[in-house]
Amino acid sequence: MNIEISNVAKLPSRFGMFKVQAFKEDEKEHLVIIKEPYKEPVNIRIHSECLTGDAIGSLKCDCRDQLEESLKFIEKNGGMVIYLRQEGRNIGLFNKINAYNLQDKGLDTIEANHQLGFKTDERTYEIVDFILKYYKIKSINLLTNNPKKLMGLHNVKVAARVPIIIKPNKFNEKYLQTKKNEMGHLLDDNKKA
């Protein structure tokens, strides 16, 4: 793994003042959004890119809601959002749009990925281990509903899982049920939203 690291820059946002640093891994450029001060265990959100949700506000998923809730939490409590360039559970934007087309025809998110020849989830988290080691972080509170992220980290202690509570909408209810029932996502708290 060949990794280049950018300088740190200030980033004012509608969620508050952050610092940002980019990590270039081969052809992918990941972003770390930092709110200081932070202390161990460090509040960490690992967020995979979702152009349709994060930038356009798609209601088919809960990605933008999770990102925004995480930024609010980090702004208030300190920590980092590690924004990974792994669009569509790492199948890429082109294939994700083809998966959306299959979902429009009745397949769920997993069936669509399989129909296109992909695994349920193609993401990897080695770069996260590298980033946490770079910042000398040994213990984290992981903001996630995805148990795979808990298992995907190898060089850090996960002290706690912090659920991200999102209210479902009529467009993403099936998607969220599939994530819960088939991928093991921990979404029971969403019913309280």
Curated annotation (Swiss-Prot):
EC nos: 3.5.4.25
Domain of life: Bacteria
Keyword RNA-binding: no
Keywords: GTP-binding, Hydrolase, Metal-binding, Nucleotide-binding, Riboflavin biosynthesis, Zinc
Catalytic activity: GTP + 4 H2O = 2,5-diamino-6-hydroxy-4-(5-phosphoribosylamino)-pyrimidine + formate + 2 phosphate + 3 H(+)
Pfam families: GTP_cyclohydro2
Family listed: Belongs to the GTP cyclohydrolase II family.
Protein name (database record): GTP cyclohydrolase-2
Organism: Campylobacter hominis (strain ATCC BAA-381 / DSM 21671 / CCUG 45161 / LMG 19568 / NCTC 13146 / CH001A)
Underlying gene: ribA
